[in-house]
From Swiss-Prot:
SUPFAM superfamilies on file: C-terminal UvrC-binding domain of UvrB, P-loop containing nucleoside triphosphate hydrolases
UniProt entry keywords in alphabetical sequence: ATP-binding, Cytoplasm, DNA damage, DNA excision, DNA repair, Excision nuclease, Nucleotide-binding, SOS response
Signal sequence range: none
Keyword Transmembrane assigned: no
Top-level taxon of origin: Archaea
Protein name, as recorded: UvrABC system protein B
InterPro entries in alphabetical order: Helicase/UvrB_N (IPR006935), Helicase_ATP-bd (IPR014001), Helicase_C-like (IPR001650), P-loop_NTPase (IPR027417), UVR_dom (IPR001943), UVR_dom_sf (IPR036876), UvrB (IPR004807), UvrB_inter (IPR041471)
Entry note about domains: The beta-hairpin motif is involved in DNA binding.
GO biological process: nucleotide-excision repair; SOS response
Coiled coil ranges: none
Gene: uvrB
Organism for this UniProt entry: Methanococcus maripaludis (strain DSM 14266 / JCM 13030 / NBRC 101832 / S2 / LL)
Subcellular location: Cytoplasm
Length: 646
């Protein structure tokens, strides 16, 4: 598999702790090419992604970067794309816009059918990722934990593809047959990824994993020319000699395998039915035979993934193929925010199995449905030959299983970890109001973390009554609206943002001059030492920022968090003095508006009348500009707000 080398493009060079971190990580990867496990302990804002990009360039290994949610995966994907414009950087997350898994609730005798809405763009990006890693080595795939779920056999995916070559003797009808075999659909009217059309001696195909049209021109029974067209204007982009056509879907099954799978399903059904009572037995038999009929007639059925063990000829208990199987053996895994991602990977299998158990026990699924599952953590570990755990607060697993912990404490900007103060829990709200007033005078913002959603709402309402412009973030707000709220905070449309655990990873706002942690002495998940250090890190983008922990007593978590912050701050200060560096607040451009806010739950009641006035002006402006859809959307938002104050 020949491919270009990774070439890192950046306007800046490694600085601060980055040089030592890069050298340390590369050294272990070269010294232990088959068992390199390392932790990059990098403080917030130290440029951990840039460090990893440098490591990838130096070791030249195909790389899988795993993040614990789609938002972080998207951020990392965009950063790596900027660093490696000449190489393949791909994105692999769950392709469901909406997903309701199949389940059965025995207590209510309620069966819930699977309901899902697939995002075609993300499905295309997933196909692009797998076709890239099977074709070349200069590939970085940024993924969510979706990468440990079943994906189809990579060998079969590659084998069932075929090459189109200029000068090749082949009938047009044979090309069409091959395309249909690998899930391409003929449609002479509308051409989208995964479809093809035929006109005379010309075939236009859009591979499932790209946007450009591939035009194949025949001369009799020979391929005369192949070139790529821009689908927008049909202009010719470039001519090519050959093209390898991968399937349009990840799950492709040869006809012979389909027959064997059906026989295997029927055999399992016969063996399992005696274990069920009459009602459950009848239900399962009826459902399974209907599914088989659909597979024979159409090639698929609802919930076909539950029969994947039979189609892939796996033994009972064997894991399904997943994205990790598409990589070559020497690939590098980077686990971002590992203190969050590792526990998430650990928990996936158990959650899936408990849901399937009631479906199997009550005759809705065969026991082989258990084997349509994510990897167990023990199975995932087998892929971790070369792994870098990345976190400001690595967990016990990472620290216990690393050859070394490489620290990245010094920021390229010279910024120090913020000063941390402990203040009494009494009058914490009044103290926050005073601090917010000080920050407003300085043109800076405030972040407050509470322990519950209700407390966040009540505090936001109270702050609004005290003339503090405040909003809160909650788990019901989707990614785009969350981005918009953060954008408005940065623009100064309000001064104080209240949240729960949403204020930890991935919220980097340079304008924040004060972070207040309420009830810091309540030991638990949101107030353990790792969570406190992550929250303190939200203030590490501003040279003058400070953090206050409101506590009635000094817990072990507070002691550890404060001690670690002071240790880092001391090292950073010494480095700055030695190299005559003055810390500079990060200057980060504010992105253009993404979308109008349609979720109104985060707006305090006291602020609603003013928001309505602003929105009405925006609605009339949109209507005058003939943007009727936008005007309707704003009108609906105003209606929601008016209901809230009735």
């Amino acid at each position: 598999m020949s491919s270009p080398d990774f070439k890192l493009k950046a306007e800046f060079k490694p600085k601060g702790s980055q040089l030592e971190a890069i050298a340390g990580l590369v050294k272990d990867l070269e010294k232990n090419p088959e068992k390199s496990k390392q932790t990059l302990l990098g403080v917030t804002g130290s440029g951990k992604t840039f460090t990893i990009a440098n490591v990838i360039e130096k070791v030249q290994k195909p790389t899988l970067v795993i993040a614990h949610n789609k938002t972080l995966a998207a951020q990392l994907y965009n950063e790596f794309k900027e660093f490696f414009p000449e190489n393949r950087v791909e994105y692999f997350v769950s392709y469901y816009d909406y997903y309701q898994p199949e389940s059965y609730i025995p207590q209510k005798d309620q069966y819930i059918e699977k309901d899902a809405q697939i995002n075609p763009k993300i499905e295309q990006m997933r196909l692009r990722a797998t076709s890239a890693i099977l074709s070349r080595r200069d590939v970085i795939i940024v993924a969510s934990v979706s990468c440990i779920y079943g994906l189809g056999n990579p060998e079969l995916f590659k084998e069932m593809g075929f090459e189109l070559k200029v000068g090749e003797k082949i009938k047009r009808s044979d090309i069409i047959e091959k395309l249909v075999d690998i899930q391409y659909e003929r449609n002479d009217m509308e051409l989208v990824p995964g479809r093809f059309r035929v006109k005379g001696d010309t075939l236009d195909i859009i591979p499932g994993y790209q946007d450009d049209i591939l035009r194949v021109e025949m001369f009799g029974d020979e391929i005369d020319r192949i070139y790529e067209l821009d689908p927008k204007n049909m202009s010719k982009k470039h001519e090519i000699d050959s093209f390898y056509m991968y399937p349009a879907k990840h799950f492709v099954i040869p006809e012979e395998d389909k027959k064997n799978a059906i026989n295997s399903i029927l055999k399992e059904l016969d063996e399992w039915l005696p274990n069920l009572d009459m009602l459950k037995s009848h239900r399962l038999k009826q459902k399974t035979l209907y599914d088989i009929e659909m597979i024979e007639e159409t090639g698929s059925c609802k919930g076909i993934e539950n029969y994947s063990r039979h189609f892939e000829n796996r033994k009972e208990g064997e894991p399904a193929y997943c994205l990790l199987d598409y990589f070559p053996e020497d690939f590098l895994i980077v686990i971002d925010e590992s203190h969050q991602t590792i526990p998430q990977i650990r928990g996936m299998y158990k959650g899936d199995r408990s849901r399937k158990q009631s479906l199997i026990d009550y005759g809705f699924r065969l026991p082989s449905a258990y084997d349509n599952r994510p990897l167990k953590f023990e199975e995932f570990k087998k892929y971790m030959n070369n792994v870098i755990f990345v976190s400001a607060t690595p967990g016990e697993y990472e620290l216990d299983n690393s050859n070394q912990v490489v620290e990245q404490i010094i920021r390229p900007t010279g910024l120090l970890d913020p000063e941390v103060e402990i203040r009494p829990i009494e009058n914490q709200v009044e103290d926050i109001i005073k601090e917010t007033e000080k920050m407003v005078e300085k043109g800076e913002r405030v972040l407050i973390t509470t322990l519950t959603k209700r407390l966040a709402e009540e505090l936001t309402e109270y702050l609004a009554k005290r003339n503090v412009k405040a909003r809160y973030l909650h788990s019901d707000i989707d990614t785009i609206e969350r981005t918009e709220i953060i954008r408005n905070l940065r623009l100064g449309k309000f001064d104080c943002l209240v949240g729960i655990n949403l204020l930890r990873e991935g919220l980097d706002i340079p304008e924040v001059g004060f972070v207040g942690i309420l009830d810091a002495d309540k030991e638990g998940f949101l107030r353990n030492d790792k969570s406190l250090i992550q929250t303190i890190g939200r203030a590490a983008r501003n040279a003058n920022s400070k953090v206050v922990l409101y506590a009635g007593k000094m817990t072990d978590s507070i002691k550890k968090a404060v001690s670690e912050t002071e240790r880092r701050r001391k090292l950073q200060k010494e480095h700055n003095e030695k190299h005559n560096i003055t810390p500079q607040t990060i200057v980060k451009p504010i992105r253009e508006k993404v979308v109008d806010i349609s979720d109104v739950k985060h707006i305090p009641v006291a602020d609603i009348p003013n928001v309505i006035v602003e929105l009405e002006a925006e609605m009339y402006e949109a209507a005058e500009a003939l943007e009727f859809e936008k005007a309707i959307k704003i009108r609906d938002t105003i209606a929601k707000l008016k209901k809230k104050i009735k």
